[in-house]
């Protein structure tokens, strides 16, 4: 293989600001330290470790609301600690950026939860504080509990959410 045709492999860690992400119940294991997800030191240590390991980035997934799709209730998610409770992942990034130089930060943020102006302000601030090391996973939300948490009667239909997202992105580009 010629040097020009070689492709780079990018390595990231996939996290969530919750007791567990895709490994529901692991928080019960005595050696699991994700139970410290609510402490800044946990995230700073993770960022330092990722940078020492030469990873390219830390991606923090997020979902607004508690999983209420299994049996129409949040009981199963809450019992297993499955992505609940969750913290706002954007608030963790500046602490991780402070203790690293090269790691990139990706974060999920829903267009359904913020006004475009406040969203642009928050993400522009993070982009500056990280020296341009911020990426955004754009989502529109999909949990009824998230919609109810925002005072809505129900989650908007899929196509309507994406129509709103298109308008939202148009507004963001102008800001």
Predicted regions: what is each one?
Residues 6-9, 14-37, 111-175:
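Flexible, glycine-rich active-site loops centered on histidine and acidic residues
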Residues 1-99:
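N-terminal beta1-alpha1-beta2 module of alpha/beta enzyme domains
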Residues 54, 101, 130-132:
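Active-site-proximal glycine-rich helix-loop-beta segment
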Residues 85, 108, 115:
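Glycine- and other small-residue-rich loops at beta-strand/loop junctions that grip anionic moieties
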Residues 98-107:
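Conserved catalytic cysteine-centered active-site region
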Residues 61, 108-109:
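Short His-Asn-centered micro-motif
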């Amino acid at each position: 293989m010629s040097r020009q045709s070689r492709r780079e492999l990018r390595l990231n860690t996939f996290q969530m600001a919750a007791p567990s992400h895709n490994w529901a119940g692991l928080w019960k294991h005595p050696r699991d330290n994700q139970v410290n997800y609510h402490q800044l030191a946990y995230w700073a240590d993770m960022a330092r470790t990722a940078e020492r390991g030469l990873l390219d980035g830390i991606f923090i997934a997020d979902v607004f609301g508690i999983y209420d799709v299994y049996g129409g209730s949040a009981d199963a998610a809450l019992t297993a600690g499955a992505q609940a409770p969750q913290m706002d992942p954007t608030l963790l990034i500046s602490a991780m950026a402070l203790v690293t130089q090269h790691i990139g930060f990706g974060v999920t943020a829903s267009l359904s939860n913020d006004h475009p102006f406040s969203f642009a302000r928050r993400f522009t601030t993070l982009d500056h504080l990280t020296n341009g090391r911020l990426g955004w996973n754009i989502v529109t939300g999909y949990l009824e509990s998230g919609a109810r948490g925002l005072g809505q009667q129900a989650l908007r239909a899929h196509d309507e959410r994406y129509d709103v997202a298109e308008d939202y992105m148009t507004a963001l580009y102008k800001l």
